[in-house]
Amino acid sequence: MSSRRRTTVAFVAAALSALVALTSTVAAQSPNRELIDGLEYQLLYAALPLTLFVLMILIYAAVKFHDNDDPQPTTEDPALEITWTAATAIILLFVGLSGYSVLVNPYISPSQAIDTDDRSQEGFDSFQDLPDTGDEEVHVRGYQWEWQATYPDANVTTENQIVIPAGEDVTFWLTSDDVIHSLFIPDLGVKQDAFPGDYTRARTVVDEPGRYDVVCAEFCGAGHSRMQGEIVVVDAETYDQWLSENEGTVAEAPNPD
């Protein structure tokens, strides 16, 4: 086997290995992450063959016509023009429908509460006016530069820790005390902005107990990089017991193990 052929084979093998690594992921821990990952792979599988097809045409044209000393204008070909126009329309339709099917999912775009100007600067009193979602609810307030969570059923508060039960639908109601913050949980595929004076909603369900990093994804001042926290997911029994034991207090999150 020639040196050039060995190089080509090695390059193809490396490319295939990279593709396998790219498309191999651990099981998603929430429907949010599962939906987002699924959309990304759908678009990847559609884009990859198209990219290779275009590259093959470019390589073919470069090799075939690189020494053409008498180039001629391209002749009109209505059938070819109709074909690539129709193909482009089909691809765009596929992308649009794939994206829309994810965006309308209730975990990705839950119904939002209407904006209100009646916000208490002293605590979470104004959260009480928000509609009942039927989920386990956590009220989250962002401020420079921490997250504070309150659990209305037991009036428990945590700092930079948000405790939720595993296997149950959870709604986070978010607001901000000062500037725009953004609650971002990468492992769960949850991201929602928190605005001063307004209330926004994020929704998820987490399958397994554990700890998941939380960061602020909106530049919010000099301490932005320090605005970190965690989602602590525990089983439902531990969650209920933790709420009852810490009612009316500022508490530490229970151990998910």
Task: Report each predicted region and the residues it spans.
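Short beta-strands and strand-coil junctions in structured, solvent-facing domains, enriched
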Residues: 146-148, 180-181, 190-191, 239
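Extracytoplasmic beta-sandwich strand-turn segments characteristic of Greek-key/jelly-roll folds
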Residues: 30-38, 68-84, 162, 185-208, ...
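Extracytoplasmic/periplasmic beta-strand context in beta-sandwich domains
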Residues: 138, 181, 227-230
